[in-house]
Amino acid sequence: MQSRITGTTMPVLEFILDPNESIISEAGELSWMGSSIQMTTHTQFGGGGGLFGVIKRVAGGGSIFMTEYRAIGTPGELAFATKLPGHIVPVEVSPGHDYMIHRQGFLCATPQIQIGVGFQQSLGAGIFGGDGFLLQKVSGQGIAWLELSGELVVRDLQPGENLRVHPGHVGAFQASVSFQITTIPGIKNMIFGGDGIFLASLTGPGRIWLQTLPIAKLAHAIERYLPREASRQTVEGGVVGGIVGSILDNMR
């Protein structure tokens, strides 16, 4: 198997698969493929077989279906492009060396990689933290390619070193990093600061990848340019609904 990442702003991951080699991805990620590539879409790839494997993927923000792309007979070409400006990051996964990634962060992987929910220290991580706190866990044996949006800042945290991050900027981190929810200090800061209520607290040791273009923030920035009728529908709940909506937007 050969792979390369080409491009800068909107990179693409290209493979040349030898006969019988395969790559898995969530359904709908394909960009192009050669004539010798055979597609098989199933619920059993990427998380173990059966209902439990499907539940793990969906709970982590993934898709019910996964697709396997296999070269049959002759080498085959296969490619996956990013959906947003950003970077494609390969990580080597092995037992005891798992990764946590944001829920839109999985692009593709070798067949023995499993995708599931990243259970965290606090229940609030899955409910109150927005997109940045709903994490997928990448485990198994092989290579996974992650899709992170915007520019990347890579930090190697030392044991006990802590960094508090707006949730949407958490792209990925090694499972050795401790993750929990903290709140922004001060009631005035929460209400009027415009930075939301919750922060992700990351404590080393381990590597973290911070992304500069959270998908939720990009969507929020584009929202103001939508037709007025579409914007008005977001506040039909009245004044209270508007206040709640504003708070939720800031949590992203």
Model-based region annotation:
Residues 1-252:
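Composition-driven recognition of glycine/serine/threonine/acidic- and proline-rich low-complexity segments
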